[in-house]
Amino acid sequence: MHLSMMVNKKFASFTLAADITVSGDRIGIFGTSGSGKSTFVSMLAGLLIPDNGEIVLDGECLFSSSKGINLRPEQRRIAMVFQQHCLFPHLSVKNNLLYGFKRCPAKYRTINFDTLVTVLKLEGLLDRGVTKLSGGEKQRVALGRAILANPRLLLMDEPLSALDDSLRFQIIPYLKSVSEQFGIPYLFISHSIVEMRLMTDTVLFIEHGTMMEQTSSEQLARNRIGNSPVGYINLLQLGQSRQVDGLFSYGCGAGELLISAGNEKSEALFELSSKDIMLFKKHPEAISARNLLKCTVISTFESGNRVGVELAYGEQRLIAEVVKQAANELNIVVGSELYAAIKASAFRRIR
């Protein structure tokens, strides 16, 4: 997908000015509430008309104020998944799914209904009314309806924000299937850096209606370590565990991690904040933290008044953070060895 968009839209107390050129299949739009993310995608989808400018998607002009071009939403072949699922309450799950499919010209119908139902695990829900579904089930149906419209681009506008944490991370694999299973590029809109890292490769950062930055999702997280109350969130995909003295032991890097909130499933995904990793220059004699990892510094970076420290523990990568004074006192440089202490309770299982 290649998108070029230079548009302006003025409201009573807000002006959006977008001037971007971006390519890729997994693009994120990041910003706080009210920054202009939804306005941006509404103009792209044709739901909102810019005051002036031009929008070109994959070589086709969707809007041009100078040329008098403004394709209708249905002509643009762009589907949307919203924060609120927006399903038709009088239709069954199956008929909700088929709604967009039936309105898609036959020449564009490349996605098989049965395949989609299997991938999104909707087999047992087809005859049910949507009002009886859980929040996660409704969002899967909304996603399926959008995919069956066979769009050339899918816009996902805060699709996880109405769900609790456990449901959010259950839904993410289904959202990723848009690109991985069906080959549809997407724009994913969110104010969550963790969601950006799980869902996107390239991120457009919007602030006060202006495109401020185009970067990778990983760099976005690193750039904000200094002013984020939760720091940098390490995401650890860990495999088979065993129980040890009331804790769960997971193989990791050059050794193991002891975790309180584990389980005995084959795989689990954990969050670990950079703020929960304490660094030592020498091996401490005795500490209460159950994990003490001998690591090698592979990079450092500054963000605000903090220093991010990227550590290698075997093949596992972790990012810790310290204040600049501590970085100087510990003489943290690339190649030096540090001990990372982490409490077993610091890990949060998210899937």
Question: Where in the sequence are the language-model features?
Answer:
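Glycine/charge-rich catalytic "coupling/switch" loops of P-loop NTPases
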Residues: 254-301, 324-351
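Conserved ABC ATPase signature
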Residues: 129-133, 137
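A short, proline-enriched helix->beta-strand linker immediately N-terminal to the Walker B motif
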Residues: 148-152
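Catalytic Walker B motif of ABC-type/P-loop ATPase nucleotide-binding domains
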Residues: 154-158
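Conserved ABC ATPase "signature" region
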Residues: 60-65, 108-125, 176-177
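ABC ATPase NBD coupling module
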Residues: 62-79, 103
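Internal alpha/beta loop-helix hairpins
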Residues: 180, 189-254
